[in-house]
């Protein structure tokens, strides 16, 4: 069970990084970032079951879920604002911070 959790976590992390690097759409990049956060939480739970009591891993997991929810809400609000102004959510067309 331990190895399966780590393999699934590594797979989610690789898919998330690949999606983050190759995506041109902001929403797709946010979804890839959420996959990375899910891989982190799966690692916390898997490793806490092996090395420590479960409470420590669950506390860190709840913290990561809270950070991921705040990141998703902020990212979607920014993507919606850029879509309203630029009519596109492509990352390469979003040059709002350039002088």
UniProtKB/Swiss-Prot annotation:
<keyword id="KW-0812">Transmembrane</keyword>
<dbReference type="GO" id="GO:0016655">
    <property type="term" value="F:oxidoreductase activity, acting on NAD(P)H, quinone or similar compound as acceptor"/>
</dbReference>
<dbReference type="GO" id="GO:0048038">
    <property type="term" value="F:quinone binding"/>
</dbReference>
<keyword id="KW-0793">Thylakoid</keyword>
<keyword id="KW-1133">Transmembrane helix</keyword>
<feature type="transmembrane region" description="Helical">
    <location>
        <begin position="59"/>
        <end position="79"/>
    </location>
</feature>
<feature type="transmembrane region" description="Helical">
    <location>
        <begin position="1"/>
        <end position="21"/>
    </location>
</feature>
<keyword id="KW-0618">Plastoquinone</keyword>
<keyword id="KW-0150">Chloroplast</keyword>
<keyword id="KW-0874">Quinone</keyword>
<dbReference type="GO" id="GO:0030964">
    <property type="term" value="C:NADH dehydrogenase complex"/>
</dbReference>
<comment type="similarity">
    <text>Belongs to the complex I subunit 4L family.</text>
</comment>
<keyword id="KW-0520">NAD</keyword>
<keyword id="KW-0472">Membrane</keyword>
<dbReference type="InterPro" id="IPR039428">
    <property type="entry name" value="NUOK/Mnh_C1-like"/>
</dbReference>
<feature type="transmembrane region" description="Helical">
    <location>
        <begin position="31"/>
        <end position="51"/>
    </location>
</feature>
<dbReference type="Pfam" id="PF00420">
    <property type="entry name" value="Oxidored_q2"/>
</dbReference>
<keyword id="KW-0813">Transport</keyword>
<comment type="function">
    <text>NDH shuttles electrons from NAD(P)H:plastoquinone, via FMN and iron-sulfur (Fe-S) centers, to quinones in the photosynthetic chain and possibly in a chloroplast respiratory chain. The immediate electron acceptor for the enzyme in this species is believed to be plastoquinone. Couples the redox reaction to proton translocation, and thus conserves the redox energy in a proton gradient.</text>
</comment>
<comment type="subunit">
    <text>NDH is composed of at least 16 different subunits, 5 of which are encoded in the nucleus.</text>
</comment>
<keyword id="KW-0934">Plastid</keyword>
<keyword id="KW-0521">NADP</keyword>
<dbReference type="InterPro" id="IPR001133">
    <property type="entry name" value="NADH_UbQ_OxRdtase_chain4L/K"/>
</dbReference>
<dbReference type="GO" id="GO:0019684">
    <property type="term" value="P:photosynthesis, light reaction"/>
</dbReference>
<dbReference type="GO" id="GO:0009535">
    <property type="term" value="C:chloroplast thylakoid membrane"/>
</dbReference>
<dbReference type="GO" id="GO:0042773">
    <property type="term" value="P:ATP synthesis coupled electron transport"/>
</dbReference>
<keyword id="KW-1278">Translocase</keyword>
<protein>
    <recommendedName>
        <fullName>NAD(P)H-quinone oxidoreductase subunit 4L, chloroplastic</fullName>
        <ecNumber>7.1.1.-</ecNumber>
    </recommendedName>
</protein>
């Amino acid at each position: 069970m331990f190895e399966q959790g780590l393999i699934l976590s590594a797979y989610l992390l690789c898919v998330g990084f690949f999606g983050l690097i190759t995506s041109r759409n902001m929403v797709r990049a946010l979804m890839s970032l959420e996959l990375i956060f899910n891989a982190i939480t799966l690692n916390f739970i898997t490793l806490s079951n092996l090395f420590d009591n479960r409470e420590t891993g669950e506390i860190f997991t709840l913290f990561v879920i809270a950070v991921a929810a705040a990141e998703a809400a902020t990212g979607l609000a920014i993507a919606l604002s850029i879509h309203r102004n630029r009519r596109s959510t492509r990352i390469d067309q979003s040059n709002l911070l350039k002088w």
